[in-house]
């Protein structure tokens, strides 16, 4: 029987406090996360940002137990999926490829080659495609495949996005309905989707389909939820986790929470729509930061829907995705990593970065000047930022 390797791709996360700095460095070294007009500055800037943000990020991870649970949860998902697929009669072994922390993609490739898999199904644990999530992981996998003649011999099929998959939608509906059932007035409970944001330029200039897929997904979930419950609930979609001075997708989660409080919303059902497992954005950002904002705004009942993790219906859905991928038309790594025609992702491809095209030159100059000032101050150990207590 053909031996199939199912490669689950995910973000990764620091497992210990000491991992936070290196994890952030890996994250910001990715040109699909931060784009610079001068590629040579990518790694120095990644070092600078990770150095500046480490302490704050470490405090966030301490508030959820000292590390990210993303590896543990992804390993549980992999085991459950492997078991489900073997129950279907498939000779499947699951592997994990994290983008920014262990186990890295290189490790998964080595394991698959050592195990002698005959075919690979690549399944990103991101329901919605984005340049900075699935796109980055696909492109990293393609780069490694292109440089490995032995790896190239193994046939590969990819799942690009799967936000409309029935098992995924059903599992979301089941978890949302659990929280709605706890409300005194289930019909009026407000469904609050919060998705991880991306810079607005990703969508408007780079052609990232992420925003459209998130919006379509929220409508599909609401439609299925109405069929399941027999009534319609009001809902809102927002975007969280923005960083830096550039404009991200709107509306911002923290601002919408304040508006909903002013609108006298009592029962809020918070749905982390772009996350399939618990991690820092759900456990700390939503459960602590956003809950505090909501309570200050006057929202009485803040109920957060659990992440999918190993919810049985979700695992069933993932298994159906793998089977469909094996039986359906082939989407190879070249097609999966393909970006919209108008995307110009890297600095050498001259995609303008910043707030708008006309500000490209000045944004680049200002960024480089700020970078050099910060770099000199970090090396010298003195300067205005030290006097202000920032460094």
From Swiss-Prot:
- Its predominant location is cytoplasm
> What EC identifiers does the entry list?
4.98.1.1
Protein name, as recorded: Ferrochelatase
| GO MF | ferrochelatase activity; metal ion binding
Taxonomically, the superkingdom here is Bacteria
Location of this chain's protein in the cell = Cytoplasm
Organism (species): Prochlorococcus marinus subsp. pastoris (strain CCMP1986 / NIES-2087 / MED4)
**A Pfam entry, by short name:** Ferrochelatase
Task: Please list the residues that bind Fe cation.
Answer: 196, 281
Q: What is the lineage of its organism?
A: Bacteria, Bacillati, Cyanobacteriota, Cyanophyceae, Synechococcales
> Corresponding gene?
hemH
Q: Which reaction does it catalyse?
A: heme b + 2 H(+) = protoporphyrin IX + Fe(2+)
Pathway annotation: Porphyrin-containing compound metabolism; protoheme biosynthesis; protoheme from protoporphyrin-IX: step 1/1
Taken from the UniProt entry, a GO cellular component term is: cytoplasm
